[in-house]
C-alpha cells in the first residue's frame, strides 16, 4: 500500500468514526423520572449536560428511595410547589452533604422547570426541589454573589403539568411553625428513573 493510499484510507476511516460518534450522540437521551404523587403522576426530563452535579445528586436520592413517602410541604399557587425533604408528619429527613450551585448553567426558572431549593447560602441545596408554576425570572442567575446567584434549574416537566397545577391549587396554612403547607397532604409516593 502506498503512503498516499494509506493516508486516504486513514482519513476516510476517521470520517466514518466521527460520523458514527455524532449519530450516537443524537441518540443519547436525557434521564427521565416518574414522580408518583397522591394527586397523580408527573414525568420530568433531567439535564445532566447543563447541571451535572445537580442531576447526579437528584438521581442519587431517587435511587436510594429517599423521596418515597415524602410530601410537597410548601405550595404557593402563583410561584412554585416544593417537596423532597419532609415526611407527612413534617419531620425533616437527614440528607447528604450540600452541593455546589449550578444556577449559572443558562437554564431559566420558567413554568414547568425543576430547580433546587436552598437556604440563603447559594451552595446549600441537598434533596429539596421545586417545580416552577410561574415565570420566576427573579430566581435566575445574575452573578456569583449570595443575593444574585439564583436557583439551579436541572430539568422540566414533560408530562403531568395538569397534576402540578392541581397541587398548586390546594389550600395551605401553618403547620409545625411553617407557612404555605398544604392542609391536605400531597404525598410523593415514589420517584423512579424510567429512562
Where in this protein do the model-derived segments appear?
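Cyclophilin-like peptidyl-prolyl cis-trans isomerases
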Residues: 17-195
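Bacterial N-terminal signal peptides
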Residues: 5-16
Amino acid at each position: 500500500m502506498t503512503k498516499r493510499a494509506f493516508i486516504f484510507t486513514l482519513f476516510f476511516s476517521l470520517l466514518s468514526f466521527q460520523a458514527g460518534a455524532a449519530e450516537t450522540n443524537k441518540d443519547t437521551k436525557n434521564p427521565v423520572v416518574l414522580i408518583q404523587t397522591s394527586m397523580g403522576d408527573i414525568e420530568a426530563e433531567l439535564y445532566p449536560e447543563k447541571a451535572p452535579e445537580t442531576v447526579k445528586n437528584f438521581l442519587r436520592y431517587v435511587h436510594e428511595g429517599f423521596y418515597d413517602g415524602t410530601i410537597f410541604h410548601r405550595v404557593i399557587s402563583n410561584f412554585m410547589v416544593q417537596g423532597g425533604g419532609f415526611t407527612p408528619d413534617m419531620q425533616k429527613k437527614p440528607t447528604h452533604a450540600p452541593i455546589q450551585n449550578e444556577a449559572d448553567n443558562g437554564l431559566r426558572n420558567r413554568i414547568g422547570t425543576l430547580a433546587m431549593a436552598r437556604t440563603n447560602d447559594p451552595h446549600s441545596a441537598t434533596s429539596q426541589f421545586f417545580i416552577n408554576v410561574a415565570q420566576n425570572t427573579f430566581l435566575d442567575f445574575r452573578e456569583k454573589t449570595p443575593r444574585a446567584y439564583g436557583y439551579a434549574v436541572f430539568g422540566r416537566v414533560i408530562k403531568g403539568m395538569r397534576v402540578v397545577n392541581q397541587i398548586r391549587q390546594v389550600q395551605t396554612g401553618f403547620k409545625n411553625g411553617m407557612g404555605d403547607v398544604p392542609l391536605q397532604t400531597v404525598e410523593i409516593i415514589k420517584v423512579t428513573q424510567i429512562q
